[in-house]
Amino acid sequence: MYSLTIFKNTYDNKTHRTMSFDSWDKFEELLYKLSNERGAKGGNNSSALISPARFDEGRTRSNKSVNKWGAWSCLDVDSYILADTSGDVLVQLKKELYEKFGAYHYVCYSTASSTEKRPKFRLVFPLTKEVDAKDLSHFWFAMNKQFKEIGDEQTKD
């Protein structure tokens, strides 16, 4: 089961908006749908945010309120440097990501602050099980090492 928590914007700390999917394919459909929506970064009018974090009932958004991750993880990539910028940036980015991470199943989508010259994106990975809160710091450290620390350190989901 893949599950997520939805936040209206960057300031929203309410954790009651959740969704669950019984297959990765259905979860992917949501990701692709969200990626086609027009986004805005930051503030009360920003795009909705999703997180694999599931929270203790009645608690607000904070690390200490997380009880598990819903069988997926992602890396927010805000400072990726393309090896070759002479051609089409999107084509080059796809090529480089495939060369580095093609052995893994993942979904990649751009974030609201992405530009053609400075792509910012999320890599979303299915997991074989949920990650309990007690294991999250070790899991995050291992995942970041595995993926060459390309993820934004401030965003641990």
Predicted stretch roles:
Residues N144-D157:
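Flexible helix-coil linker/hinge segments at domain or subdomain boundaries
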